[in-house]
Amino acid sequence: MWSSIAALPVLVPVALACLGYEGGVPTPTAHYSNSAVIEVAAGQVFDAGWAKYDRGSGACNDQSEGDWKDAVFYLHSGATLKNVIIGANQAEGVHCDGPCTLQFVWFEDVCEDAITIKNDKAGQETWIIGGGAYHASDKIVQHNGCGTVNIINFYAEDYGKVYRSCGNCDNQCKRNVYVEGTTARDGGEVVGINLNYGDTATLKNVCADADHPCVFYDGCAGDCEPKKVGYCSG
């Protein structure tokens, strides 16, 4: 399905170009397995030069919920991570404490979530530009903060959701997501947002084979389960 979808409001899908790179995960220039998370300071840039990073054999705990200490990279507010491959041996991929920028970050096999964004405020923006993720049985991008996430020219294959606004965070809020030029194959939802909290989603130039690329939920706060309540577009 080639689509341009916005919610709210919803636009009629049209055929447009998508630019997610479909040539597979780049060949790494080096491989590093680290026993601890790599922290990138606020406002700093970490350019991996196309090396692969992971946390060593057995790091993935089969969907056990982890925190930032289980991640491969932990980005403080305003930090940038670029030109890197996150290997399969990890429980969490990248955690952002506040808005961050990811440029050409690839995930060869997602364990729990590839990217988790938290503590961003309304009006702050996170950018995920290029790159892609494979084999994310649950979510690629988990958004727990209250800002806007922009996903541009991304590639996803074999996934549950490309983006999910947190369904049951203790402190809920309105979140926004913008997806453009992205390719999503063999998966579920491109975006899942909470209708009852006023979330917004815009999908432009997205190529996806999902029956319903944009899905509405009723979110909740705390120890509860959000409920699927409809679709942003047919």
Curated annotation (Swiss-Prot):
GO terms for biological process: cell wall organization; pectin catabolic process. One of its GO terms (molecular function) is pectate lyase activity. Its cofactor is Ca(2+). One of its GO terms (cellular component) is extracellular region. SUPFAM superfamilies: Pectin lyase-like (SSF51126). Its EC number is 4.2.2.2. Binds 1 Ca(2+) ion per subunit. It catalyses: Eliminative cleavage of (1->4)-alpha-D-galacturonan to give oligosaccharides with 4-deoxy-alpha-D-galact-4-enuronosyl groups at their non-reducing ends. Residues 1-17 form the signal peptide. It is found in: Secreted. InterPro entries: Pectate_lyase_PlyH/PlyE-like (IPR004898), Pectin_lyas_fold (IPR012334), Pectin_lyase_fold/virulence (IPR011050). It comes from the Eukaryota. Keywords: Calcium, Carbohydrate metabolism, Cell wall biogenesis/degradation, Lyase, Polysaccharide degradation, Secreted, Signal. Pectinolytic enzyme consist of four classes of enzymes: pectin lyase, polygalacturonase, pectin methylesterase and rhamnogalacturonase. Among pectinolytic enzymes, pectin lyase is the most important in depolymerization of pectin, since it cleaves internal glycosidic bonds of highly methylated pectins. Favors pectate, the anion, over pectin, the methyl ester. Belongs to the polysaccharide lyase 3 family. PANTHER family: PECTATE LYASE F-RELATED. This is Probable pectate lyase F. The gene is plyF.
